[in-house]
Amino acid sequence: MKKIVSYMMTGILLLSFLLTGCGSPEPQTGKKMSMYYINTAETKVEVHEQYLNTKTLDEQLDETMRYLSTTPEKLEYKAPLDMGFRVLDYEAEDGKLLINVDKAYSELSPTTEVLVRAAIVRTLTQLPNVKYVGITVEDSQLYDNAGEMVGWMNAEQFINNDGNEI
């Protein structure tokens, strides 16, 4: 009889250990950010929530740039900084973030280029002390497909109309 009770107690103890991992997931911590990605058809940007685990602006900027360079788990989205060009460097100063990319950026289609800019700017202007984002191509000013200079941008410059971005 003692053996049966002992086996039952051992079983209950093991079961309780196994079930402790079945609870609800622990809440995410850190700064909640909306990360913007491009759908695979390259017709709109999609938002996904992420939590930054860093504190300083430089660390948050580095972490955000890593997110924007990494293809999401859902393969129906593309990372805006993983579209065939490289970020050479970036620098934040006085509320402005300047991103310098290689000349492969100039080979993006006009639609894709606007979506990439929208995703980058909408994401990065959520960081504290980043009010504007500028993009240069190998240290030269960026021009749009109409030949107009693209200067400092903020999130309000990009429309959001449920999938018809352009």
Q: Over which residues does each language-model region extend?
A:
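Bimodal "functional hotspot" detector
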Residues: K2-L15, G21-I166
